[in-house]
Each structure stands twice: as structure tokens, then as C-alpha cells.
């Protein structure tokens, strides 16, 4: 099959095509979009001012500095350290890796894993998890969720997985794990020598103190988990492309 003969299979692209076709056929209809997690307000003034200052600095001979540190600027890493420390979670600066967004990290981190690994993915969830692994040829197993289990899948000892995806709060259901529930997943991962890829993009919306905002609030998680987060939601940053990944030193 030629590449030009292939049809788009990314969920959001398919939905966009259907929405465009519907709008063309029904221009009088107003569509409420509950798909991609975009924001509805402009960038905060402090963000815009900081960007202006950075561009101005780079436009001077004295201020131009070219490429930044490959793992991210220390001032941003230190701010992330402080953000986690405010919730009682300690991170080392060299455990934090700044990137161009969580979506990129979710794909790039898979370069650390073999293509014959088995991947456990909750259903429903952010479709990128499946797309990235199918592209690499990995086997996908689904952890089914429903209203009966609060849309929160729990470990099944009869299932063996090497890579475990957890999104909490979940996209799209909004369901979030307690620390006790996440401890069950940590124990399962350690038992199976698996790695949890924890998507914390929506952690800032958690207000219930019984719910974990980081998997590193759970004992043992530093030995089996990688946490990926985005500024898109906490800072209204969609389209600006900035996020980070936390890889603990204990993870082998």
C-alpha cells in the first residue's frame, strides 16, 4: 500500500473530519466540543510578558544564548521541584526532564522499551497511548472500565504486562485514583517487573486530598514509575508546547 493511499487513523483527525462535514451540512447548528482538551481563554499576561522578555533578550548580542540546556533550564526544573515539594513529594533536579509537551514525551519515552513488550491500557483513555504502541508493533491489552468500577481499572493478577498506562484524572472520564488504589498498581508493577507510565496532565484539577496528584505520593512508586505532565492544563498553555517528565533514580 502506498502512503498516499492510507487513510488517517488518529481519532482526533477522524472526529475533526466528521465535525467539518456536519457543520458544512448544518451551518445553523452550534456544536459543543467535548473532544480534544483545549482551553477557551488566552494566555495569562504573566506568560505573555515572560515570552516577550525572552524574545527581546534573544534579540540582543549580549542576551542571545542559542540552544538551551538539553534537559531543560534549571530555573524551570527548580520551580517544578518546589511545586512537588509543596505537596510533600521530593524530586531531585536531575530527575526532571523538560520537553515540548506531554504528548511528545508519551511517544519518545517508548524508545526506552523493547517492541516485544506487552502494554496494558485502560479503556477508555487518551488515544495516543494505543497509537504510539501500535506504530511500534507492541501487543496491547485493555483494562476495561465501567460505571460499576468507577471507570478505574484495577490490577488483574492473571494478566502480565510490561508497560502500564495510568491517566489520573482520566481523560476522558475524569475518574481519579486514591493513593490506596495506586498502591495496588505499584505493587502489581513491581511484582511483574513492569513500568508504569503515569499521565498526570490533569492533576491540577484534583481538590480532594484523598486523591493522589502524583504517583510519587505512593510508597514504592519511585522504583517502578515514570510521571509525565503538561503545562497545557495548569497554565492554559495549549499550543505553546511545554511539559516535563520525571524519571526517578531508583528506576532501573
Predicted regions located by residue number:
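Conserved small/polar residues in nucleotide/adenosyl-binding loops
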Residues: 1-5
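N-terminal small-domain helix-loop-helix segment of the aminotransferase-like
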Residues: 6-100, 108
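Hydrophobic/aromatic beta-strand patches that form the interior of the parallel beta-sheet core
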Residues: 32-34, 120, 141, 197, ...
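Short catalytic/ligand-binding loop motif for oxyanion handling, primarily in non-cytosolic enzymes
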Residues: 40-44, 172-175, 204-205, 236-237
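Conserved core of the PLP fold type I
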Residues: 62-189, 203-218, 222, 226
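Residue-level marker for buried hydrophobic side chains located in beta-strands
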Residues: 168, 196-197
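Walker B catalytic acidic pair
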Residues: 200
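Active-site PLP attachment segment
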Residues: 211, 217-252
